[in-house]
Amino acid sequence: MKVSIYAPSYKRPEKSITQIHYPCVKVVVCESQADEYIKNGNDVVVCPDSAQGNISRIRNWILDNLYNDSDCLMIIDDDCSYIGYYNNQKQYKFENDQLLEFCSSSALLCDELGYKHFGFNCVADKGAYREYTPFGFT
């Protein structure tokens, strides 16, 4: 399953660090800011300035314009220092290839269960996780 991961960003190229840790992520920025992000070393996808306004508008632009490029489209924050999971009370951080594999297998599982979208817990606190009951269908 082909997975594409995008991180919308706005007026903060220096804080857009997700690509440092996960080069597979494409940062989505508006035309007027693209040069700043490119100078910062980001690999960008440029959207029109008219798509910008708030995070919901840019996420909708990503869904409307970039979804056909892959089987699974993920949208994450532009300032992630790591993405990981817990197993046996220990935290593990994904490497780039592991993140792609995890997203691909998660998307495949959801598809097989008849679901079309899913999300991950974004809280770093171990107490917020139920590692032995990893799925919720609410």
PLM segments and residue spans:
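Active-site-proximal specificity loops/subdomain of glycosyltransferases
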Residues: 31-72, 76, 81-95
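Conserved catalytic core of nucleotide-sugar-dependent glycosyltransferases
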Residues: 83-138
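A generic secondary-structure signal
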Residues: 19-20, 61-65, 105-109
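Short, well-formed alpha-helical segments that are part of the catalytic scaffolds
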Residues: 4-25, 32-38
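Hydrophobic beta-strand segments of well-ordered beta-sheets in folded domains
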Residues: 2-6, 23-28, 42-45, 73, ...
